[in-house]
Amino acid sequence: MREIVHLQTGQCGNQIGAAFWQTISGEHGLDSNGVYNGTSELQLERMSVYFNEASGNKYVPRAVLVDLEPGTMDAVRAGPFGQLFRPDNFVFGQSGAGNNWAKGHYTEGAELVDQVLDVVRREAEGCDCLQGFQITHSLGGGTGAGMGTLLISKIREEFPDRMMATFSVVPSPKVSDTVVEPYNATLSVHQLVENSDETFCIDNEALYDICMRTLKLSNPSYGDLNYLVSAVMSGVTTCLRFPGQLNSDLRKLAVNMVPFPRLHFFMVGFAPLTSRGAHSFRAVSVPELTQQMFDPKNMMAASDFRNGRYLTCSAIFRGKVAMKEVEDQMRNVQNKNSSYFVEWIPNNIQTALCAIPPRGLKMSSTFIGNSTSIQELFKRVGEQFTAMFRRKAFLHWYTGEGMDEMEFTEAESNMNDLVSEYQQYQDAGIDEEEEEYEEEAPVDEPLE
């Protein structure tokens, strides 16, 4: 079995993580104590991807929960699914990182990191064939961003050949929690570019928009936002957790989605989007799912793919779906919107099918796109970063923890490089490459 070890760091990561475990426990027929009382054999078949079987028919998530302050952990432990997790897997400090990336990455976080790695090692040893790691965190804070990226690079060192997927909540343009978000995010992206294999970008503002516009919620809570994120996370990992005709795992996903190793930042979407109560009022069809899935309003990152082009994308359908119908729809999308797909990667939509729909739905689809328009997101953070860094605002918080201004400059230029790489592939066409060769061809001049 191909197991995945899940890490959640910081407040945001722990809250999203908790929502994710709640969602997939439900899908696998586990109650809040991890005891199986499901109905279908299929729920058990690949349970071991995310769960360890303990004694007495109890299943325990392969999850490591990390934070630098006890608050969020206590909330998870007191929450509806608090009894699900193994008590030894809660690793927390007391001091907090105070939204300071340097504290999470260099001082406070570094003290805790060995303790976390011990737990990760123990989880990894309990696996038959570890496929990789997934980590949920935000990029705007101190613990999730600073310590999260520290853990990623440490795990990278120890398990260099395993996949590393991150679900990263990027700071959004209008909804901001702290003033130093641009610093934390830029320093984190600098790390993710090098150390992660696939990063699913999620953004609070886009989630708010989906809640307001599509789900008609007048004032969405973080619970509603986390519910959306967990729907996507559950969709991305469906193929790993249930048997299907066309399965993909983290590695296949990466092979199909990442044309150039640095460009692994994906936009995600989910269809059908229904608010938590309103599942049962309408039937959905494959064309409808496809249309909703490719709708920019459905993307969970605040960048509009119509401003860029898709390098690759992947569609994961769940439920009783006809293979042929899916393929026809995908071909249809590509033919009608060919300007939004780069022409130098033929058939760049990958599809996967899984027979088991999410709870309460007949069928659903998850969309993962590697679009060049994700650069908008980095550009936006980069502009805010430059505005503050030019004045050296708030820098003493970071230099006081032993960081150097050089690191900021490096992170900034690495992020700018990323943006221009995306831009370069957005502009690249097929003809340009041929023209270059023509220029280089020797001209047949008569010899003097």
From Swiss-Prot:
GO terms for cellular component: cytoplasm; microtubule. SMART domains: Tubulin, Tubulin_C. Gene3D superfamilies: Helix hairpin bin, Tubulin/FtsZ, C-terminal domain, Tubulin/FtsZ, GTPase domain. GO terms for molecular function: GTP binding; GTPase activity; metal ion binding; structural constituent of cytoskeleton. It is found in: Cytoplasm, Cytoskeleton. Its cofactor is Mg(2+). Residues 429-448 have a biased composition (Acidic residues). GO terms for biological process: microtubule-based process. Coiled coil: none annotated. GTP binds at residues 11, 69, 138, 142-144, 204, 226. Its main location: cytoplasm. The keyword Ubl conjugation does not apply. Mg(2+) binds at residue 69. Keywords: Cytoplasm, Cytoskeleton, GTP-binding, Magnesium, Metal-binding, Microtubule, Nucleotide-binding. CDD domains: beta_tubulin (cd02187). It comes from the Eukaryota. Dimer of alpha and beta chains. A typical microtubule is a hollow water-filled tube with an outer diameter of 25 nm and an inner diameter of 15 nM. Alpha-beta heterodimers associate head-to-tail to form protofilaments running lengthwise along the microtubule wall with the beta-tubulin subunit facing the microtubule plus end conferring a structural polarity. Microtubules usually have 13 protofilaments but different protofilament numbers can be found in some organisms and specialized cells. Tubulin is the major constituent of microtubules, a cylinder consisting of laterally associated linear protofilaments composed of alpha- and beta-tubulin heterodimers. Microtubules grow by the addition of GTP-tubulin dimers to the microtubule end, where a stabilizing cap forms. Below the cap, tubulin dimers are in GDP-bound state, owing to GTPase activity of alpha-tubulin. PANTHER family: TUBULIN (PTHR11588). This is Tubulin beta chain. It comes from Epichloe typhina.
